[in-house]
Amino acid sequence: MMKYLIFIFFLVLSGCGSTHKKPPAPAPAVQNVAPRQNTVQIPIDSWKYKIIDAATDEWIFFGQQKVIIEQDDESIPHVGAWEDDDWAHIERVNQYWRAVGMSKLSGKDCKEPWSAAFISWVMREAGVSASLFPPAPSHRDYLSHFLAVGQNPGAVFVPHTIQEYKPKPGDLICANRGAGYFGDVVEELPSSLNAKLHCDIVVQTDAGLLYAIGGNVRNSVSKSILKLSPDGFLQLTRHRPWFLVIENRLD
């Protein structure tokens, strides 16, 4: 089977209101989804596994779109379903918005970034209480909470810079977003946050690669594949200016 490869030079984490049109799908082929395996080597009854499982289910529902990030280049070897492709996916995005109290929005509202609503929904589906992970329509809201309480004894979501902590399955990785944004590596935790942020859920690390699932990534629930540094740390890239890792200490 020929590989279906599209190079993206200016990736914008936005909905279908962007100027990008959906690429044509590859020739139809029968796709067999492999049985779910515990590839992350964590207990299947743990909170982390439930979070990863919920995120993976949504990725499968949206057609398993993949985004490969290699230095400053990005590609989409497999295009999945987009937020406004059909009623099922339009309504699924509505379910994410309902998790943050915004029930009137759906996949048709293409200019409303829904990545934070997606993560809030995943946390709720996994059974994480709102007292531990406050649901929010904006990443800045829950990240500001973690920055304020993350150093308290017993904190379960603890922020780190990308230089001081190696991301693990169940963690969140966060980046600034917006056209043309590209800054230096953050050496200290910020005291305030940009309104335009994006976070993904780490689902696997293996052989120097990190796999993370997020909503509203190229108009879908996508799995991004990143190359870690030789020491296993997240690397800043032009299209993904990562600056923060939220360590998940839930058992």
Name the predicted role of every residue range.
Residues 2-8:
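Sec-dependent signal peptide recognition
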Residues 135-218:
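...with weaker cross-activation on analogous glycine-rich loops/strands in unrelated enzymes
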Residues 20-131:
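N-terminal capping segments
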Residues 1-2, 173:
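Short hydrophobic/aromatic-rich beta-strand motifs
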Residues 12-15:
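C-terminal motif of bacterial Sec signal peptides marking the signal peptidase cleavage site
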Residues 3, 19-20:
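Large, modular interaction/toxin scaffolds in secreted and membrane-associated proteins
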Residues 216-251:
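Low-complexity, Gly/Ser/Thr/Pro-rich intrinsically disordered linker/tail segments
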Residues 66-70, 132-135, 185-186, 223-225:
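Short, solvent-exposed loop/turn and secondary-structure capping segments
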